[in-house]
Amino acid sequence: MYSIPDSLKSDIGAFAKHVHDFRNGEIEAVKFKAIRVPMGIYEQRKNGTFMVRVRCAAGMITPTQLKEVALLARREGTEPIHITTRQELQLHNVQLEQAPGILEQLYHLGLSSRGGGGNTVRNIMASEDAGISPVEVFDVTPYTLALTNTLIAEPDSWSLPRKYKIALAGNDSDNANATFSDLGLIATIRSGEKGFKVFIGGGLGSKPTAGFKLSDFIPATDLLYVGEAVKILFSEHGNRRNRHKARIRYIFYKLGEERVFELFHEIFNRLKAEGNYELVLPEVSQALNKGQLIDFNPENELPGKWLKRYAKAQKQTGFYSVEVPFNQGMAKAETLIKLAEFLAPLGEDVIRFTMRQNILLRNIPGQLLNSLYQELKDLGVEVDLPRILNSLVSCAGADTCRLGICLARGASSAIKDSLSGISEDQLDELSDIRVNLSGCPNSCGQHNLSNLGFYGKASRNDRLYPAYYVVAGGRTGDNKARLASKFGEISAHDLPQFTAQLLGKWSVKKERFSDFNEYLDREGQTDIEELIANYESIPSFETDKNYYFDWGAQDIFSLAGKGAGECSAGMFDMIDFDRDAILDIQKGIEHSSDQELINKSLYGIVFHASRMLLVTRGIEPSNREEVFTSFIQSFILEGHVRQEFEPVVKLALENSEASFIEFRALIDELGKTVIGLYNNMDDSLQFKTTPDIPKVIGIVAGAAPDKRFKDFRGVACPMNFVKTKIELASMKSGELLEILLDDGAPIKNVPGSVRNEGHHILEEKQNENFWSVLIRKQ
């Protein structure tokens, strides 16, 4: 398992205080969201209801941990437990006051939700059969854990331009989606040395693409340097200005493959020269007992069919892996508790979560398979169904997600029912087909990588109705990665029948093709287009109301309840809140003659304009006085905003009820100026303006450089590093900065992060319960 960072306990304590302050009205909702989401806590579609995402590196969890998480979910009333397409667990229907306690309990289990959301290093995925596959190059599990341990312990992993997704695969077939990750690593061996093929910049959201191949081989011992170098590259060159263009792939779109790789190698070589990242592989304990080979064909009856559908022989003789299906990844707590109790005697490495939202058991002795079958059957697991019926993937969709357009889970259930009309023999022929659904274009259901996929949209006839785009032909793997192609759209109502008809055609033609993708390339595209054409006509609401209800919905389809997603919650949410407030206030008083309202509104413009961009300087004001004084210090005196605005800001500081009407034109101009400054801010949060202050004289050759001083005691990670980084950004090469840091996580994390930026740590000196760190800017 991965190691919990030293800072997590204090992070949870700080989060509990933030929850208290938010509930008491001391923190605005937009600022609290920026705190909450990086802790892995998302608001669901129903206001005031939340989801907690639990990190499970490589999809690993021990039987003890699984049982305790299930008991926790049962105690807290957060069932069912959701297995995600990124090999994690999610606890749904959490009330905000429950969240700190849940995080504390997860901490004591050796589990963390930190980085489950926001602009952070997300859960690192790995091949579900890592360590047991007869065809893997080598086991990538310990490498996944080592990379996780390093990255989640560093404060700059929580303040990236956007999410950073990593995956490791055991061979070129890439069953971990490494070729479509921000950083993808595929195991390989060269001249007897273990290593990885490296891909950078893959992704499935907006403007999806396969990763750009950096190298056919980097030594496995360089793994941490690669992970760190990509993170620093992302942090320095990622677009912090526009969240819709903030993933690593957009750096490639902007700078080109050659330049991005040059930047990577510059950072990588610098890190290697410093030599701070020694690879230490955690031991993964398999604790195998003696296994026994079994016959997979004891006639053709259950559990023989179950074995053929769900069990595979491992490379360890006498041991087997078994896929345990959970419909749409939803599991009852009682089921997981009993399953964990059954598995506990078999050791700690017996469970992996899969990207098809199921559990893959491993290291199961052959002699226990019949007992396992009976246990699963007693628990109500659908062990007797053909595999394709238990491997349909869907995201949460509009059931709980704020971005969801369609009820993807309902559509998935309807497809399952429709496919059930096909004979079992035909369904068994479809066992390897990947059918994936997403409730919107964001690809949380991984439709872009499916053999046959769908993603939700709102279409209109005489009124709105739920529909899906049809995509097909996605594949992963070195030299063959390909996104699914879009063919057209179909109503949600017709989707199940369409799916059954298409897969029925494939099952009849299957013997003529090597796989489904060859069928698509030669005949399948025509079949899809013809079937879509058959369903083009949508009856009016009066003729057939069923088309205007989504699967599982009680109400007529609409976009009510759809809202902004929270994945990128952070700095720009707070900025946008103040910007929108300025614009709304200006519009609200444009034609008003109410002098009292106008005066109060003008003060509001000064307040929001003063606060709007403070976060870009690492400033988090706790009261109105700090808002105004910080704005004067960091924007007016620094020359980013004209000095003529200073008197009106000071007036607001001194008296919120003063007369502002006589300064109306100036205040309107202040609002426009700050918004204009924001609009001209570059990707790295620097302002494209000439500061209205005298230039600082550079360092004279041979002269002792000036030393700046900043006291960051009491400032928690990662804000202490953010403040240090901002201070260094305003300095010249060779200048010195002395900072004071608290003992514990700050001194452990900040100096290392500063080194990663290329600066030099000249001295670290302890003074009782704090440290002095002297930095020379590169």
Identify the function of each model-found stretch.
Residues 570-588, 610-696:
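Long, charged low-complexity segments
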Residues 772-778:
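Core SAM-dependent methyltransferase catalytic element
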Residues 697-731:
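An N-terminal amphipathic alpha-helical segment
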Residues 719-725, 729, 743-759:
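Amphipathic alpha-helical interaction surfaces in cytosolic regulatory modules
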Residues 766:
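Long, contiguous binding/interaction regions
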Residues 1-588:
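Peripheral terminal and linker regions in Fe-S/redox and tRNA-modifying enzymes
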